[in-house]
Amino acid sequence: MYLYIETLKQRLDAINQLRVDRALAAMGPAFQKVYSLLPILLHCHHPQMPGYLDGNVPHGVCLFTPNEIQQDYLADVEARWGEPLAPSAGGELPITGVYSMGSTSSIGQCHTSDLDIWVCHQAWLDTEERNQLQQKCSLLEKWAASMGVEVSFFLVDENRFRHNASGSLGGEDCGSTQHILLLDEFYRSAVRLAGKRILWNMVPVKEEEHYDDYVLSLYAQGVLTPNEWLDLGGLSTLSAEEYFGASLWQLYKSIDSPYKAVLKTLLLEAYSWEYPNSQLLAMEIKQHLHAGEIVSFGLDAYCMMLDRVTRYLIQINDTTRLNLVRRCFYLKVCEKLSRTPASTGWRREVLSQLVSEWGWSNEKLAVLDNRANWKIERVREAHNELLDAMMQSYRNLIRFARRNNLSVSASPQDIGVLTRKLYAAFEALPGKVTLVNPQISPDLSEEHLTFIHVPAGRANRPGWYLYNQAPSMDAIVSHQPLEYNRYLNKLVSWAYFNGLLTSKTHLHIKSANLCDTVKLQELVTDISHHFPLRLAAPTPKALYSPCEIRHLAIIVNLEHDPTTTFRNQVVHFDFRKLDVFSFGEQQQCLVGSIDLLYRNSWNEVRTLHFSGEQAVLEALKTILGKMHQDAAPPESVDVFCYSQHLRGLIRTRIQQLVSECIDLRLSSTRQEPGRFKAVRVSGQTWGLFFERLSVSVQKLENAVEFYGAISNNKLHGLSVQVETNQIHLPPVVDGFASEGIIQFFFEGTADEKGFNIYILDEANRVEVYHHCEGSKEELVRDVSRFYSSSHDRFTYGSSFINFNLPQFYQIVQLDGRTQVIPFRSNTLSQLCANIAEKEASLPTKQCQLH
């Protein structure tokens, strides 16, 4: 047994040294410096060293002996300090070991690979000590970043995996969905930089089920000493739930880094396909180690992963994804075989051998090696392949869940976050701008982009076509369009957010008076100024919550501009009666089209188009419907107007209207469930009704409906609309009715628990409310305020809203007779004064528009 253990230790040390040498060989000078010095910087704590902070910070790595590079560094620090450093304390030190893991040292490592470092510490560190050690590691991350090296430290309690404790979704160590699988990756890829050897490697695969008992027997026999080994525990049997959760996590990661994640995603799929007889890859590597079979180019973790996935895909006869995973592997290795190398290293030799086995041509290698110059056609093809592969993995995962009757043990919140991000990234929806370049190519910019409009009645579908060519007949005819959409805004947004359209792109447009180059360039400038391309990824909290509009652009009259008919005409209008939604004598709506462009809290980009006289109302209802009542207001709301005439007035009016409606939508509460907003469009008045759960639009045909709508939001009574000859009004009301004005009559009820109200419009049509409950004073104030602010809400030339304030009366009993007296309200006198002031400030002359 002793000789067997010693042989294993020698193999372990040899493979570890091979991995250290390979890691350093693939690094530039800055990476080599950081990688070599991290152990000594965690072992020592000194003001002259990076990572220093005041306090009793845990430091010191068990069994650590500095190598030559580290000794030279210590000598340099002592020379600068002027005195020798204090020797390390004896006994068990706080840090049990420092290990790199992941792609470092494997064939998958390239010169830009980041470093994932596990700092394993003693279980006896208290919370404050762990926090101090975390702060030290954070300072070391900043020190490395100052040299252009990305390092991520992970503090690992030596008992962490025994207690099934995992991190949260916000961290790189995933979430509750991973536990054993995280340990699997560590065991198969760890490189010991300092500290204790990993005990798990010493336990034969056949003893894995009895891991703890076997370890105790080794200690009891004296062949191993407990304080010389890091023991994170055995790889117990994985549950179906854990496979499910971990696979979802890999899909989550694949969205932002597809080539990197495809291989791991398929490894997990292979695990689940073999379930319940799965053998983790780390176990397979350990089996080779114990047998003395140093296969797969020195038990390289990435090569072993490719081999395992290859066997699985061949077994299920999936040649499509096999070809994809080989391309992903090739690109991950970063060795361009079609080009002459400066030197030949082991990675190039291995990759050449694999490519020869795959039968790849030189042309295929040249295409892959030119990835940095891929443009939209090639990138979209690659994106679609990656998407198909991800979705196939997802479908297989769902089948796995059904087959095993899963009750997913992963945190419901984690699962919700994962599925939300998959939905946001992958689901194709009308109006959604699909982002096709998740780290596939660094630059998709085009020198020329041409937008061509095809009207209805032609051979091609009506709408807009996008070409990455200058608009010559030969170029257009001989090329397929990059993208098609019925609406220009969607195409421009797609080109911009996917990086094709930049400040250096030459824009061309061909359309029959819908849009010209000037207007198109204005749109591009507006979008680029208000929508940054790079944003932080949505937080798990945002993904777990309902999506909310964050940045909203309202694009007015891009494709249809009613003001173009004013060209070379004299248009008479009065500023006092100027309403861009019911303009002039014809009460024409000057908004012909509205496009919405918005980005939500899940970082989705969406577009919508509305045209015709009702575009304003439809757009408003849609915007407000996407804002749940408890949502945060958008961070920005911008109106881009491209009208030929009255551009500023139209933009300002829409900005005011949208801002007011958003405020009404987000401020409606259970205590005040109904709010009302009237908008006059093309001579018709419409009401927007703001309820807690929705916003509805209703046409208001006459004054009774209008004022009834207002009062219905303030009074809780039964409303009945009738004609005058269908009801017997109180004689005093009938005799008081006056055409041409709106009249409100309040009448007390016999039980004195409420009141009735009669509303007469200009034509003396009646609406009656019985047994109303509420404040008459509040009703009078709100109705009068709606009317007095009519310049903001209506055209002054409304067919039924005239410039006389509505009249309010109280039906009373005086001297035994029923009489009508004016309703006394301080509100009315103040509103009358405000109106008089408004009138005085308005220009009275007519204006002409040329």
From Swiss-Prot:
InterPro entries in the record, alphabetically?
Adenylate_cyclase_1, Adenylate_cyclase_1_CS, Adenylate_cyclase_1_N
Instruction: Output the GO biological process annotations, alphabetical, semicolon-separated.
Output: cAMP biosynthetic process
Q: According to its UniProt record, which reaction does this protein catalyse?
A: ATP = 3',5'-cyclic AMP + diphosphate
Its Gene Ontology cellular component terms are: cytoplasm
Judged by the first EC level, this protein's enzyme class is lyase
GO molecular function terms attached to this record:
adenylate cyclase activity; ATP binding
Q: Region labeled Catalytic — which residues?
A: 1-535
- Give the enzyme's EC designation: 4.6.1.1
Q: Where in the cell is it found?
A: Cytoplasm
Write the protein's name. Adenylate cyclase
Q: Which organism is it from?
A: Yersinia pestis
Which gene produces this protein?
A: cya
